[in-house]
Amino acid sequence: MIFMKDNIVTVEHLSFTYKDSEEPAVKDVSFSIPKGTWTTLVGHNGSGKSTIARLLNGILLPDDNPETLINIDGITLTEKTMWDIRDRVGIVFQNPDNQFVGATVEDDVAFGLENRQVPRPKMKSIVQDVLNQVGMTNFQKSEPQYLSGGQKQRVAIAGILAIGPKLIILDESTSMLDPAGKFKILKLIRKLQKENELTIFSITHDINEAEHADQILVLDKGSLLASDSPVDIFKDVSLIKNAGLDLPLFYKIKNKLINKGISIPQEVNTEEKLVKYLCQLNSKM
Ligand SMILES: Nc1ncnc2c1ncn2[C@@H]1O[C@H](COP(=O)(O)OP(=O)(O)OP(=O)(O)O)[C@@H](O)[C@H]1O
């Protein structure tokens, strides 16, 4: 097997069937994720997204098949390499309350470092650094359960960052936040990804969130329907419909305008820019 040097994740022929289930939850899925990029796995409820997240760090093990491969950062996932993989892959779940273990924010963020027997002075400096990166320095003595939903997610992300993972999986981790909170966390993730050269694999049923990614994987009933850039994925309206999803608002409006013969320049690629462009067009008429 030859791995593409620039892919941090290579998945081939991945299938998984839950015990007592007749139908596989994940069916012969193959994809790769280039290092330092953001990939979003999108699919409706029950399409198999969380199962794939759990397979990627060995919480679940794939169905037996000699052709199946999960390779992360050059390490092929087996029962033996599971702990090496877990050091490289951090998962932030939907409900951060289930992840907190420390009485205070700083204790919580330090937890993974304590487990890895990191010396105290180094631990303190890492905790300060990651709390600073997620904008939570002022809350280090707070009890995690009394924080807002967005603040809790920041602390959960800091705890994962502290371990120094190569890949961060975000499993519906903004789904409990209001739109403004969601946007702030997505912006933070993009910032962290760029500053730390991290690879992000986010999982969502919210198609609007998928717009932020470099690559989108579309999952339906356990099968991968497509993998491409957001622009190319959202060109294919029938693909999105077949996956039981809806187009993001920006693409809906853009497609309607194109159908009415109004061409939209490529650089007009956000709702904000589209509104500005239409106002300019209107003032010229
Ligand atoms: N522990 C389990 N035992 C048996 N079946 C399961 C288990 N967990 C999930 N499933 C089934 O596997 C399929 C995929 O579930 P999964 O949670 O991966 O989907 P999902 O896309 O993450 O859904 P959601 O968006 O609702 O979280 C579903 O049919 C689900 O009912």
UniProtKB/Swiss-Prot annotation:
The keyword Metal-binding does not apply. Keywords: ATP-binding, Cell membrane, Membrane, Nucleotide-binding, Translocase, Transport. SUPFAM superfamilies: P-loop containing nucleoside triphosphate hydrolases. It comes from the Bacteria. ATP binds at residues 43-50. It is found in: Cell membrane. One of its GO terms (cellular component) is ATP-binding cassette (ABC) transporter complex. NCBIfam families: ECF_ATPase_1 (TIGR04520), PRK13648.1 (NF010167). Forms a stable energy-coupling factor (ECF) transporter complex composed of 2 membrane-embedded substrate-binding proteins (S component), 2 ATP-binding proteins (A component) and 2 transmembrane proteins (T component). This is Energy-coupling factor transporter ATP-binding protein EcfA1. The lineage of its organism: Bacteria, Bacillati, Bacillota, Bacilli, Lactobacillales.
